[in-house]
Amino acid sequence: MVNVVLGSQWGDEGKGKLVDILVSHYDVVARCAGGNNAGHTIVVDGVKYDFHMLPSGLVNPNCKNLLGNGVVIHIPSFFKELETLESKGLNDARGRLFISSRAHLVFDFHQRTDKLRELELAGRSKDGKNIGTTGKGIGPTYSTKASRSGLRVHHLVNDNPGAWELFESRYRRLLETRKQRYGDFDYDAEEELNRFKQYKESLKPFVVDSVDFLHKSIANNEKILVEGANALMLDIDFGTYPYVTSSNTGIGGVITGLGIPPQKIQEVYGVVKAYTTRVGEGPFPTEQLNEQGEKLQSIGAEFGVTTGRKRRCGWLDLVLLKYSTLINGYTSLNITKLDVLDTFTEIPVGVSYKYKGETLNSFPEDLLTLGNVEVEYVTLPGWNQDITQIKKYDDLPENAKKYLKFIEDFVKVPVQWVGTGPARDSMLEKQI
């Protein structure tokens, strides 16, 4: 059985918390895309664990964890994150953590050129705005992957005669193409090569053939949970391009990033923040550049785990959520951070877009259109009540339940979980 957790908006919806709640029922947690460019925090017994690249299933001592072939891996960051988690008590993580031999490697020069590229794009744009990259080298690594010039994990750990010489040769050739593109920037290639030569033996115990690993798990009737990174609106194909990440962050990325056929996927859980946030540039139809937006930002503590950047805030956008649902095929929803809305007397919800006076029938792919739509709202009554101590769905205020029902009716997908606070147990489950 394979179930999937996916972000439905622009990321930061709270996917990790749902995964954390679910992992006790699973044998394997796998990541299928992205790198250390996303982040979430899980609190267990009062201890905060920050995850950026590693699967959050590591908090469950009985769970195996896999970084799939679609993930791009910066080895120094991999070990740094692992050591940080170990320092907080996850001492058995090394025996339960695996990396696909087909995953691509992120080098420091990928990160360097990521930032150079961002500056270059900002200089070209009329408004001086950039894409909003995290600078972690994710985009350049996927670029070298697509051009078939990248290096994969198996290239590094290969013990065949001449394997290291081939790795070194390809590394130098890859670096040279970067320098041809961005100029002869100061960079110590010998230092990085020496580091990777030392990483080789340390990395070997983690490396597996991920296709064999996962399909053996499926054959053994093990339960597999896929932890999506980022979210659908950051998908390279279906997101607000070019203000997106460089991988497929929707259901398609699960299939290609792990080698799992679609017939094996049973449930797709869409994680939806009760309002909308976004980090970086790009159109945001329901954004509130006013006191309401500042209030959402303040109460919701909307700062990125990985970058520390302030998140832009706005009302829930059901046009966007319906589009996300069409593509990912959610079987149920997890509405998170509902408690952030506790003190709002009225809560507007975006239900349609108008452009040049006409209602749009689909989510626009053109940013000039999306950036200039007029959002039509339905205003729902707030509940003006602290819900953080509520332990059962049925005990939620009536207006809170009406808010959730409005979402269900609009996208035609049932709400299964509701987040009512930051704690691990602040999640209500609804029978569906």
UniProtKB/Swiss-Prot annotation:
Q: Name one GO cellular component term.
A: fungal biofilm matrix
Alphabetized, the UniProt keywords read:
Cytoplasm, GTP-binding, Ligase, Magnesium, Metal-binding, Nucleotide-binding, Purine biosynthesis
Quaternary state and interactors? Homodimer.
Single GO biological process annotation from the record:
IMP metabolic process
List, in alphabetical order, the Gene Ontology terms for molecular function in this entry. adenylosuccinate synthase activity; DNA replication origin binding; GTP binding; magnesium ion binding
SUPFAM superfamilies reported for this sequence: P-loop containing nucleoside triphosphate hydrolases
**What is its cofactor?**
Mg(2+)
The record describes the protein's role as: Plays an important role in the de novo pathway and in the salvage pathway of purine nucleotide biosynthesis. Catalyzes the first committed step in the biosynthesis of AMP from IMP.
Protein name, UniProt field: Adenylosuccinate synthetase
Which organism does this record belong to? Candida glabrata (strain ATCC 2001 / BCRC 20586 / JCM 3761 / NBRC 0622 / NRRL Y-65 / CBS 138) (Yeast)
Taxonomy, top ranks, is: Eukaryota, Fungi, Dikarya, Ascomycota, Saccharomycotina
Q: In which pathway does it act?
A: Purine metabolism; AMP biosynthesis via de novo pathway; AMP from IMP: step 1/2
The record's listing under HAMAP family reads: Adenylosucc_synth
Q: How is the cofactor bound?
A: Binds 1 Mg(2+) ion per subunit.
Q: Which family does it belong to?
A: Belongs to the adenylosuccinate synthetase family.
**What's the short name of a Pfam family annotated to this entry?**
Adenylsucc_synt
Subcellular localization is given as: Cytoplasm
Q: Tell me the residue numbers annotated for binding substrate.
A: V305, T306, T307, G308, R309, K310, R311
